[in-house]
A protein has these predicted regions:
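C-terminal flanking tails of non-heme Fe-dependent oxygenases
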Residues: 1-177
């Protein structure tokens, strides 16, 4: 996938770093429909979370609803026609040893119009091992995350209280910090 190759180039990784099991034994697609809500302050389309996989490519649709956490506030992302949003997932945060962060986000509803979004997830194989790449670890920069099989990572992610994305990343952080 071209976007992963470009990420490698920008981060100083070999161009084929994400080729194979880590770049996806499969691609998952979620189509989300959010009907209008008479009182959007009382319900969310999706609660705050970080995506667990490598990257997410989101076609947000024309109606605003994606919000990202920034310095304690929620910032609404305005959809741009004919464009995608690329979210870095928790597994990419692990590979880069925290250089790239998975951003906490949520889907908000609105009272005026229904919203449709399409999310495509690059899903590493369950038996793939993900940990900080050696290019991001060295003297003065120890591994900040544990190396885990993706299947184990998913199980940990699924049992964590999804109300707190911080708990998700804490569970995979290395105890060396």
């Amino acid at each position: 996938m071209e976007i992963l190759r470009l990420l490698c180039e920008g981060m100083g990784l070999r161009p084929d770093y994400f080729v194979g099991d880590i770049s996806g034994s499969r691609v998952a697609v979620d189509i989300n429909h959010y009907p209008p809500c008479p009182d959007p302050s009382r319900t969310l389309g999706l609660p705050p979370h970080c995506d667990r996989d490598l990257i997410t490519i989101l076609l947000p649709g024309a109606v605003p609803g994606l919000e990202v956490a920034y310095r304690g506030d929620w910032i609404r992302v305005q959809p741009v026609p004919n464009s995608f949003v690329v979210n870095f997932g928790l597994q990419l945060e692990v590979v880069t040893n925290g250089m790239l962060k998975s951003v906490e986000h949520r889907a908000a509803t609105n009272s005026a119009a229904a919203r449709l979004s399409v999310a495509t997830f690059i899903v590493p194989a369950d038996d793939c091992v993900v940990g900080p790449a050696e290019e991001f670890v060295g003297e003065g920069n120890p591994p900040r995350y544990r190396t885990l099989r993706v299947g184990d990572f998913k199980r940990m992610h699924n049992v964590v209280n999804l109300r707190s994305s911080l708990n998700q990343i804490t569970n995979i952080k290395s105890n060396q910090e």
